[in-house]
Amino acid sequence: MSILEVKNLSHGFGDRAIFEDVSFRLLKGEHIGLVGANGEGKSTFMSIVTGKMVPDEGKVEWSKYVTAGYLDQHAVLKEGQTVRDVLRTAFDELFKAEARINDLYMEMAEDGADINALMEEVGELQDRLESRDFYTLDAKIDEVARALGVMDYGTDTDVTALSGGQRTKVLLAKLLLEKPDILLLDEPTNYLDAEHIDWLKRYLQNYENAFVLISHDIPFLNDVINIVYHVENQQLTRYSGDYYQFQEVYAMKKSQLEAAYERQQKEIADLKDFVARNKARVATRNMAMSRQKKLDKMDIIELQSEKPKPSFDFKPARTPGRFIFQAKDLQIGYDCPLTKPLNLTFERNQKVAIIGANGIGKTTLLKSLLGIIPPIAGEVERGDYLELGYFEQEVEGGNRQTPLEAVWNAFPALNQAEVRAALARCGLTTKHIESQIQVLSGGEQAKVRFCLLMNRENNVLVLDEPTNHLDVDAKEELKRALKEYKGSILMVCHEPDFYEGWMDQIWDFNKLT
């Protein structure tokens, strides 16, 4: 029996259709991976099933008494709350039960109280608390907080002082502590390092309840799911098995469809040729009419148009001086130092990956090297003739510009055709190009930002988690382009599969701090 069912769902933004009469079901204990290219509608689907977005048509039906938890990276956290306060809200129901027990004991002291009835309710509530390990909640909170790296910045920290990545980890920890019947996870690994991803993988493998997962981290996704829903061309298709099994079946179905299409096209050509040659002759007119009827009744096989794939190409600028950045006794941070004094040298033509736990200062280091924020102590010497291209991890939301407007405003010397061609090279369609940036998926927004980088000549690329939100094809194309880039690269990245094998150096930030 389904615990979540979506029936005849259709939805779009303006004239851009996202879903067309699709259905979906989630059975108890299923581990579903929701997969598809950037912009196909995966996050939109999550927003619809959680009620954050109302579909144009169709129904979303939840079973009675089913609890669901959604990793909402935009949830509002109250000022004055500590990390522990937020994590303890995962057990609000149990704290209410404890408060009810205290009220019942107060009622027992009143004249005429029905002691037996009150004690029976106390017993039921007490059993519920003990079955949920209520009296060891803080130990459970500490266990999950430690496993996801939340302990790195402490559970007594005010949540409003957290970065976007730290905040997301707190929300993920709270969600896992709630242990709902259905987990809805949209890119949960984006802000996790390798150690924490491994823990989350083991947790989800052993999760006895159901979940729906969106992730472009394919090895992680493959290891935790047993059902795939593929989002493509406004449709949702269900496959049994893990991601790699889905790929095999999908490739086979696609190959079979293409072969059937070729056979049918040949048959159509032969029939049309026969009709054209024989319809005018009395002796063969009936045969020609018979062939024409066969053509008219034929169910035509249609191949879906290929989705545009990005083709990244970063232009090098003139050669800079030998040294790009030289940090001397550099201490970074905002109110207090995040590191010991750092002495780092980044030279011309080097490609360096910065790795390490989230929230310990990798982004702050990049911004300090670039001069965006001042150091607490020490200095940064920047080389001569630098042409810097910077890709930020987090950007402000609510951008009402279209990609066409954003790129054209940045490069007014280009004509409209040139701007459209530049965006198309990044894998964006006409509908993407003419939609507001704020309604695009995370991956599509990243492609707009890459387009801005590609149209400038840079001799240094500084990239902060550039693979976040990118689908598999875009990620592979980005890797190829960066490997071939003739300038210097300084990149923060949490995906070993992306940076290993072509970087000159790996700076482990855990060791620098």
Regions found by a protein language model. Give the residues of each.
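ABC ATP-binding cassette signature C-motif
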Residues: 1-259, 308, 317-513
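Post-kinase regulatory C-tail/linker adjacent to protein kinase catalytic domains
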Residues: 312-314
